């Protein structure tokens, strides 16, 4: 018997990932297209719709062969309306994008839209490192800090689906670094990979990205090791506060740097457990996310299936 198939779309700030995902969470085929190819002269949603239509046609599928469309999208997403209501970066023509309405019109199928970090968390819950867990915090470290929170088996979304913006938890509110959101002291200004790179470049302009920084750390560079120690302190302090609020079983850390077990994951785990009250540390697991680049697509389909159980 043929499995149900869904179109998954993961909209990022520089590219859109497209995939056909089945009812088991398997990604059957996928592709990626730039959304910034002309400096955003073409609105992101226009590029996404064109790429999605071409992708489905390239697979020899008609919309009738698909159950629905699940979208994971960067930015502040009103998941009830399926629209973009805010961003913390410079993405021209993106705020106000009616993602749900445009894709429903294009394919004649039901569409759900959720924040990308929420989708990462849901993907891990469905078929990844959080399978079988009911209380999970998922954090992605990259240009910013994204977050998804599962509590009692349900995604915490809030009134409009905007909940879980962990990166804008104001850890240094009184004397903090200005943030792209307009506030100051937001956690992502200290915990994002870009925060580590900024600090490293003040020491050596050659350390231009996470890869170069971790290579220097693995070679035993004491300056970089000290920077990493401070950076993981900042990450751990933010997570410790969240542990006291949400009492998770599991914290998953995603993003390109999450492959660094000894230099990143292990120190964060040790520091978080040392920073929380003992009862909160009991049984708490902290580890790297498993699904990597597919997490957003897989989570978008899980979100769709949760929203449309009849399909």
What is each residue range found by the language model?
Residues 59-63, 106-107, 205, 274-281:
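Short helix-capping segments at alpha-helix termini
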Residues 37-62, 187-189, 195-252, 257-266, ...:
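Adenine-nucleotide phosphate-binding core of ATP-dependent small-molecule kinases
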Residues 41-49, 65-69, 75-135, 263-275:
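Glycine-rich phosphate-binding loop and adjoining helix at the ATP-binding site
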């Amino acid at each position: 018997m043929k499995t149900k198939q869904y179109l998954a779309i993961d909209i990022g700030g520089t590219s859109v990932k497209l995939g056909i995902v089945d009812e088991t969470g398997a990604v059957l085929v996928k592709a990626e297209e730039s959304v910034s190819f002309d400096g955003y002269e073409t609105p992101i949603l226009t590029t996404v719709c064109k790429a999605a239509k071409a992708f489905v046609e390239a697979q020899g599928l008609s919309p009738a062969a698909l159950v629905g469309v699940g979208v994971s999208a960067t930015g502040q997403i009103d998941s009830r309306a399926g629209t973009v209501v805010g961003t913390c970066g410079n993405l021209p023509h993106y705020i106000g994008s009616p993602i749900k309405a445009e894709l429903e019109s294009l394919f004649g199928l039901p569409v759900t839209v959720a924040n990308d970090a929420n989708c990462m968390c849901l993907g891990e819950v469905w078929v990844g490192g959080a399978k079988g867990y009911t209380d999970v915090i998922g954090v992605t470290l990259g240009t910013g800090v994204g977050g998804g929170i599962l509590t009692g088996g349900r995604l915490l979304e809030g009134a409009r689906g905007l909940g879980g913006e962990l990166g804008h938890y104001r850890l240094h509110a009184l004397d903090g670094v200005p943030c792209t959101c307009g506030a100051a002291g937001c956690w992502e200004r200290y915990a994002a990979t870009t925060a580590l790179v900024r600090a490293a470049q003040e020491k050596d302009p050659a350390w231009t990205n996470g890869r170069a920084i971790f290579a220097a750390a693995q070679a035993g560079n004491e300056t970089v090791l000290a920077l990493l120690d401070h950076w993981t302190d900042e990450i751990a302090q933010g997570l410790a506060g969240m542990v006291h609020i949400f009492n998770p079983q599991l914290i998953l850390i995603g993003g390109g740097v999450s492959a660094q077990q000894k230099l990143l994951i292990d120190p964060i785990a040790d520091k978080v457990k040392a920073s929380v009250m003992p009862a909160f540390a009991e049984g708490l697991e902290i580890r790297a996310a498993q699904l990597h680049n597919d997490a957003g697509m897989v989570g978008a389909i899980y979100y769709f299936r949760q929203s449309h159980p009849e399909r």
